[in-house]
Design a protein with these regions (language model features):
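A compositional/biophysical signature of low hydrophobicity enriched in polar/charged and small residues
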Residues: 1-91
Length: 91
């Protein structure tokens, strides 16, 4: 099965202690669907790039991974409909 769906996900946290941040990052580092994780400025703390086969797979990731991290206070999912330009190296 290939990648059929790319989702950019913003994550807001309710806890900003070192332990909360480390726990979030440890979970994300061990999750294969997450291909990028960026700490960002603004109203939320993280921006993730998630690559899955379909919307059903994304729902499973949303529930089984993000849904198990107690410090997450907000999740916004942005589904990529089409890509006009992508200069990243393709493997």
């Amino acid at each position: 099965m290939g990648i059929g769906l790319i989702v950019y996900v913003t994550i807001g946290l309710s806890c900003h202690s070192k332990a909360c941040l480390q726990h979030f990052e440890e979970v994300i580092e061990t999750t294969p669907e997450v291909t990028e994780c960026h700490t960002i400025t603004g109203a939320v703390e993280y921006l993730l790039r998630v690559e899955v086969t379909d919307i059903k797979s994304y729902k499973k990731f949303h529930t089984d991974v993000l849904g198990t991290i107690p410090s997450i206070s907000s999740i916004t999912s942005l589904l990529v409909m089409d890509t006009t330009k992508d200069l990243r190296v393709q493997v």
